[in-house]
């Protein structure tokens, strides 16, 4: 049985009941069942970068089409097949013609909870699958990786013992950061670029590892969101996985971050006005809060 996903602008669905001996006709029937797009109007793409499949031979098998388990099929409605004829283009039409809008990098907002980093990374590496329930699984995955290599993930790297860290990261009230991004970059074998809206800087995890794929996140000081490429054609699903040679994606991500900085859409964690809820002492920034916690053991802080 093949494990296939079908991705449209409406979201991602599982395609069930198919094997490598299933025909193109059976594939189209399954796609029609989950998308509502009839077989003759389907445009199906697969791979990276996505390439259109030749669906003309309905009896060809999925094995012949090199479709394999784990593939995500990008499906669009081919509206050109709906048109019986194309009207001639007049000179007036040409004079009034405007160039189509270009694909652009946009933010896909996820909930501002303690797991926004994990939700964001899962969204981009899975090709636009939004699943808040993934956070628990990803936390456990990170804990298992860290526990399996105590020499690499020692006190100096983690800021706490290996065992303490593994218990800490499994908790739903803890935040992920650079350590977790680095681990997930290695696990998913892709470069993860984090664009900081305060400094308009890109931190590139896995940059020197020779990966061919890249995903993008944007960070405002306390919250992560995934970035995706939006296309002018509303039937074209967003792109979340890029080639590491796609410098245009990085340029547009920087422009997006700079625009957010100009609008002051960031949180300077070093200037937070905080109060210790145990002794009511006023503090400024996360460094002061961290020092106070070490000195007193107080760990409950509120923003003023």
Curated annotation (Swiss-Prot):
The protein's Enzyme Commission number: 3.4.19.12
Alphabetical UniProt keywords: Cytoplasm, Hydrolase, Metal-binding, Protease, Thiol protease, Ubl conjugation pathway, Unfolded protein response, Zinc, Zinc-finger
Protein name: Ubiquitin thioesterase OTU1
SUPFAM superfamilies reported for this sequence: Cysteine proteinases (SSF54001), Ubiquitin-like (SSF54236)
Binding site for substrate: 222
Ranges where the record places region UBX-like: 5-83
GO cellular component terms given for this protein: cytoplasm; cytosol; nucleus
Renumbered residue ranges of the record's region S2 site: 247-252
Region (Cys-loop): 110-116
TM helices/strands, residue ranges: none
Reaction(s) the record says it catalyses: Thiol-dependent hydrolysis of ester, thioester, amide, peptide and isopeptide bonds formed by the C-terminal Gly of ubiquitin (a 76-residue protein attached to proteins as an intracellular targeting signal)
Function text: Hydrolase that can remove conjugated ubiquitin from proteins and participates in endoplasmic reticulum-associated degradation (ERAD) for misfolded lumenal proteins. May act by triming the ubiquitin chain on the associated substrate to facilitate their threading through the VCP/p97 pore. Ubiquitin moieties on substrates may present a steric impediment to the threading process when the substrate is transferred to the VCP pore and threaded through VCP's axial channel. Mediates deubiquitination of 'Lys-27'-, 'Lys-29'- and 'Lys-33'-linked polyubiquitin chains.
Organism: Xenopus laevis
InterPro entries: OTU1_Ubl, OTU_dom, Papain-like_cys_pep_sf, Ubiquitin-like_domsf, Znf_C2H2_type
GO terms (BP aspect): endoplasmic reticulum unfolded protein response; ERAD pathway; macroautophagy; protein K11-linked deubiquitination; protein K27-linked deubiquitination; protein K29-linked deubiquitination; protein K33-linked deubiquitination; protein K48-linked deubiquitination
Listed PROSITE patterns: OTU, ZINC_FINGER_C2H2_1
PANTHER family reported for this sequence: HIV-INDUCED PROTEIN-7-LIKE PROTEASE (PTHR13312), UBIQUITIN THIOESTERASE OTU1 (PTHR13312:SF0)
Pfam families xrefs: OTU (PF02338), OTU1_UBXL (PF21403), zf-C2H2_OTU1_C (PF24560)
Region span, Variable-loop: 169-179
Keyword Transcription: no
Domain OTU: 105-230
Molecular-function GO term, any one: cysteine-type deubiquitinase activity
Zinc finger (C2H2-type): 274-298
Residues the record marks as active site: 113, 116, 223, 298
């Amino acid at each position: 049985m093949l494990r296939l996903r079908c991705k449209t602008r409406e979201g991602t669905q599982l395609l069930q009941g198919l094997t490598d001996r299933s025909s193109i006709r059976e594939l189209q029937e399954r796609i029609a069942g989950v998308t509502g797009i009839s077989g003759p109007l389907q445009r199906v793409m697969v791979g990276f970068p996505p390439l259109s499949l030749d669906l003309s031979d309905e009896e060809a098998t999925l094995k012949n089409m090199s479709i394999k388990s784990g593939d995500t099929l990008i499906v669009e409605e081919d509206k050109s097949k709906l048109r019986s004829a194309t009207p001639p283009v007049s000179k007036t039409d040409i004079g009034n013609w405007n160039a189509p809008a270009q694909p652009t990098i946009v933010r896909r907002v996820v909930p501002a909870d303690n797991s926004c980093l994990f939700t964001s990374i899962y969204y981009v590496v899975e090709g636009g699958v939004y699943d808040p329930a993934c956070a628990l699984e990803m936390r456990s995955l990170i804990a298992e990786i860290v526990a399996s290599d105590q020499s690499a993930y020692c006190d100096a790297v983690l800021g706490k013992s290996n065992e303490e860290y593994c218990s800490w990261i499994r908790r739903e009230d803890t935040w992920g950061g650079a350590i977790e991004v680095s681990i997930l970059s290695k696990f998913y074998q892709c470069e993860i670029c984090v664009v900081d809206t305060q400094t308009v800087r890109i931190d590139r995890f896995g940059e020197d590892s020779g990966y061919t794929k890249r995903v993008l996140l944007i960070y405002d000081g306390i919250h992560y969101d995934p970035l995706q490429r939006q296309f002018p054609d509303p039937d074209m699903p967003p792109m979340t996985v890029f080639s590491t040679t796609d410098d245009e994606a990085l340029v547009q991500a920087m422009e997006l971050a700079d625009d957010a900085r100009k609008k002051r859409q960031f949180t300077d964690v070093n200037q937070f006005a905080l109060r210790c809820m145990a002794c009511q002492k006023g503090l400024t920034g996360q460094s002061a809060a961290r020092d106070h916690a070490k000195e007193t053991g107080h760990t409950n802080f509120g923003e003023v």
